[in-house]
């Protein structure tokens, strides 16, 4: 007679998946933050220095800039960044993530 017991430890698997997913979201958020900051035009440097990356909760990060004129810069009012910063950075990061995580 042979008895085999297979037990699935769902809590450990879920914790491992959550940890890996959080690391992936953090990396993508950091990549976006780095790119949007690098694309920000520089005159005085205030707009570029104004970028902040903050974790909101699990799997959620916020990239913000409270410089009053950042909206105009992002709309393309600078010859240094005529297409703005956020949309081009998002496109680049999305394409990079697709290549990196493609299976």
Positions of predicted regions on the chain:
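Short, Lys/Arg-rich flexible segments
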Residues: 1-103
């Amino acid at each position: 007679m042979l008895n085999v017991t297979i037990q699935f430890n769902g809590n450990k698997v879920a914790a491992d998946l959550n940890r890996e997913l959080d690391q992936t979201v953090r990396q993508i958020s950091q990549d976006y933050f780095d790119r949007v900051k690098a694309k920000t035009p520089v005159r005085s440097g205030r707009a570029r220095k104004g970028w902040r990356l903050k974790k909101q909760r699990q799997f959620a990060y916020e990239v913000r800039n409270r410089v009053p004129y950042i909206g105009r810069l992002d709309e393309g009012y600078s010859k240094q960044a005529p297409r703005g910063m956020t949309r081009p950075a998002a496109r680049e990061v999305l394409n990079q993530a697709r290549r990196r995580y493609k299976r």
